[in-house]
């Protein structure tokens, strides 16, 4: 899994698959797209207007939490 952010276009992308694949993009809303592989698996999730969506969550920080251990890691967003 990899999360990328493009500040030029204010887009964040959560890529769930490591290998490149042909995808079909499903528009969920004006600010959310989901990419599906031909076999129906979720390849990635694209957040448009990302800073607005992600800043509303945790004061401008991306928080990753391991629910099994309770450990968290915070990453400041640009």
State each model region's role.
Residues 1-78:
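Small, basic N-terminal interaction modules of short regulatory proteins
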């Amino acid at each position: 899994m990899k999360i990328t952010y493009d500040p030029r276009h204010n887009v964040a992308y959560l890529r769930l698959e490591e290998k490149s694949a042909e995808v079909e993009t499903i528009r969920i809303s004006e600010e959310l797209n989901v990419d599906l592989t031909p076999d129906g698996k979720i390849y990635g999730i694209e957040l448009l207007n990302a800073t607005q969506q992600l800043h509303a969550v945790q004061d401008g920080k991306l928080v990753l939490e391991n629910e099994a251990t309770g450990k968290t890691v915070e990453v400041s967003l640009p």
